[in-house]
């Protein structure tokens, strides 16, 4: 495919789940921020694994065990190359972004945060990037601080500089907000954190599916993301950590494979990355994630970004034209492919239920971001999000459904 374009109709053919009707209408799936759909190419490698070489890894010398080990470790190398990490030891497979962040909070955080230290986050964070740091602050009697947001839900460089100081030990921030679509300047925030001797842990769950990642350029100390948001299987995530940090960290789960030697009363740990992967790992899921990465790379992230930006701007303009809709977050040209909104006098769950009758799937609720909902002065919102298999036809279907919803709820019975 061309570097800056792709045929969306050909892409759609790869996703069998999209070839169905919901409530008698064509499915317009606009909820990829929660979970993306999975192409046949990924489904095929999963089937191939279970049919041909399903076995445990690292332990067996038989053929199936060797094939499974090769597939699993090749997946690690695919991820390493995808994010431009220096070393394969820097790639830890986890259950997802939440597990990755918790690993950092418990292992690095417990060892390095002391009473009186500060942990810096923002109010736009997903609960998975607030609650682990809340709990760490409580365990250590440290202070949790929040970088203020602008009226558009973005971060101002001066506010960042004023919040991060020499007491800061950890800065935890989303690369892209799962609610507002705000894209944060991780490289600049990392520079500020490092100037004060702090480390930065990035929630990349919403960024990895949509943009090319470069750990050398970004200089994040830890970076977490999930497979199920980027065309891969559920139950698989990645923690990138700088090797020199991971080497000093203690595991937080114990069992098979992560050990070097076990005696009756003591144990030593395996080398990286195995010491953080206790038990039977997520073999099929890792192999599926690697295929999802290859699928996205074949399309090209420049093309993905360009296409998603066009969809987002189109949707933003069409939705803005509906009287009574309030859209939250940055302007249309400074946001990722997510639009969070409310329809005047209609509860978001009613909006989501109503548009579902027209075949449109959107998310409704607090989106695991209750502090952000409080900041927005709402209890919940509706959210539409876009990916490589969406089209303007999907957006038009949403717009028509929203207009019908508005008309229905404005009718006086």
Curated annotation (Swiss-Prot):
Q: Which molecular-function annotations from GO does this UniProt entry contain?
A: cysteine desulfurase activity; pyridoxal phosphate binding
Which Pfam families does the UniProt entry name for this protein? Answer: Aminotran_5
Recorded catalytic activity of this chain's protein? (sulfur carrier)-H + L-cysteine = (sulfur carrier)-SH + L-alanine
- Where are the N6-(pyridoxal phosphate)lysine modifications? 229
What are the catalytic residues? 368
Question: Cofactor(s) for this protein?
Answer: pyridoxal 5'-phosphate
GO BP of this protein: cysteine metabolic process
So what family is this one in? Answer: Belongs to the class-V pyridoxal-phosphate-dependent aminotransferase family. Csd subfamily.
Per the entry, what this protein does is: Catalyzes the removal of elemental sulfur and selenium atoms from L-cysteine, L-cystine, L-selenocysteine, and L-selenocystine to produce L-alanine.
For this entry, the protein name equals Probable cysteine desulfurase
Q: Which gene encodes it?
A: csd
């Amino acid at each position: 495919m061309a570097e800056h374009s792709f045929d969306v109709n050909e892409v759609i053919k790869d996703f069998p789940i999209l070839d169905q009707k919901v409530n008698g209408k064509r499915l317009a799936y606009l909820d990829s921020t929660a979970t993306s759909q999975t192409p046949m190419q990924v489904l095929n490698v999963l089937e191939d694994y279970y049919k041909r070489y399903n076995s445990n890894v690292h332990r067996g010398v038989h053929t199936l065990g060797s094939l499974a080990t090769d597939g699993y470790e090749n997946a690690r190398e695919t991820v390493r190359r995808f994010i431009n990490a220096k070393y394969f030891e820097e790639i830890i497979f986890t259950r997802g972004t939440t597990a990755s962040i918790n690993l950092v909070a418990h292992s690095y955080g417990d060892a390095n945060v002391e009473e009186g230290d500060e942990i810096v986050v923002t109010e736009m964070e997903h609960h998975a990037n607030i609650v682990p740091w809340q709990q760490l602050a409580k365990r250590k009697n440290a202070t949790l601080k929040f970088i203020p947001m602008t009226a558009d839900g973005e971060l101002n460089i001066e506010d960042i500089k004023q919040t991060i100081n020499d007491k800061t030990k950890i800065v935890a921030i989303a690369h892209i907000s799962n609610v507002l679509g705000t894209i944060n300047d991780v490289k600049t925030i990392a520079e500020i954190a490092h100037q004060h001797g702090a480390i930065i842990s990035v929630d990349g769950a919403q960024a990895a599916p949509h943009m090319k990642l470069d750990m050398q350029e970004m200089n994040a100390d830890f970076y977490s993301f999930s497979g199920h948001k980027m065309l891969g299987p559920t139950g698989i995530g990645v923690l990138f950590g700088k090797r020199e940090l991971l080497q000093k960290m203690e595991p937080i789960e114990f069992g098979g494979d992560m050990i070097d030697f076990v005696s009756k009363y003591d144990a030593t740990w395996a080398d990286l990355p195995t010491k953080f992967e206790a038990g039977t790992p997520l073999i099929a899921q890792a192999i599926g994630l690697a295929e999802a990465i290859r699928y996205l790379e074949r399309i090209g992230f420049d093309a993905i970004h360009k296409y998603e930006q066009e969809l987002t701007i189109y949707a933003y303009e069409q939705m803005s034209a509906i009287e009574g809709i309030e859209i939250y977050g940055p302007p249309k040209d400074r946001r990722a492919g997510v639009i969070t909104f409310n329809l005047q006098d209609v509860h978001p769950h009613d909006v989501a239920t109503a548009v579902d009758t027209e075949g449109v799937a959107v998310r409704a609720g607090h989106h695991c971001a209750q502090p952000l909902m409080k900041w927005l002065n709402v209890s919940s919102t509706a959210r539409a999000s876009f990916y490589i298999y969406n089209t303007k036809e999907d957006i038009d279907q949403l717009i028509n459904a929203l207009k019908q919803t508005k008309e229905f709820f404005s009718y006086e019975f």
